[in-house]
Amino acid sequence: GGMPIQTFHAIGNHDHDMAVQNIAGDDDSAAELAYISALGPTYYAVNIGKVHYVVFDNTQYVNTGGDRSFAVRLNRRQMDWAQKDADYMPSDVERIVIAWHCPAFRRNPGASSPNPMDNADELLDIYKDKQLPVTIWSGHNHIAETVTVPRSDMSVTEYTHPCVCGAWWYFPLCHDGAPATFTRYDFSGGTITERRSVNFSDSDEQYCRVYNSGLKNAEGRPVVRLNVWDWHPTWKFECRENGAAVPASQLKAVREYDDYYVTVHDACGNDISSFSF
């Protein structure tokens, strides 16, 4: 048994003990005992190469009456520890990577899940004097999203990763149409040289999927749909037809669900209308 590689875990909302209910204050450690016994501490740091990795527990469990509720924040104990850890960070570190379960920042303020982390900037203030790039790794939302954190005093990017279970194991797709997958990062020193999804279904589907069969617009004209996930406002999209660039006037951005995702969930009888990412 066991994994053939060393694994570092980050606790999430489904890792807490549901039998522990009605937690008051910011100490939810009673709901974490089983996790700690099996997998280890809920927050810690490790140095690998030129990167300082800091793993946090930003799922503050409340579980009122067994409703699985939680807040997205760091408790004071972790915040105090983070300051001490930063004080002892090796001088040759070239990048800080923060890992936690719930995203701290969202590109879409109207997204249905979750609320932004209310003390994320307080944590980042601890690292700003290091003058190092900060990368945040998160999950939870079952989508792929990249957010450049709006701070003028430091460079911070948060990557919210798709998950291996997709949209809860119904099919190997996440809510935004991204494949159910994990993400591989390659480093050279403190530089991220490549970030690539390990797509089990189609290795060519890295950031988009094309739908080009039987689709028509409101006027009845044939259209091609292109779903791009994990996009960033700095990206440049270029579409070509028979080798020729398609004029921008023929392209239109829309906010709709991925066609494949809708088909799968319709077949399962699931209502997805309430979910917004």
Regions found by a protein language model. Name each.
Residues 12, 58, 101, 231, ...:
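Cofactor-binding loop segments of dinucleotide-utilizing enzymes, especially the Rossmann-like FAD-
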Residues 58, 99-103, 140-141, 197-198:
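Short, well-ordered beta-to-alpha junction loops that form the rim of enzyme active sites
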Residues 30-33, 37-39, 43, 83-86, ...:
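Metal-dependent phosphoesterase/phosphodiesterase active-site architecture
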